[in-house]
């Protein structure tokens, strides 16, 4: 599997868990990507649940490191 395929697979899982989630992807290398997910508070755990094991599986089976960070899109910006 390619990194692009893995990112698409994870994005599809995220969108299935929360259609309103916004996903921003940064490719760090040919084998590593970071997905920043902005979702409502009520959907954050659901997204974590549907992406955790697949991310581990991609790392173990394909050597692809897909990191998924989930943020509350309704939280006020940090001060300081």
Q: Where on the chain are the PLM-derived regions?
A:
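Short, non-transmembrane amphipathic alpha-helical segments
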Residues: 10-14, 45-64
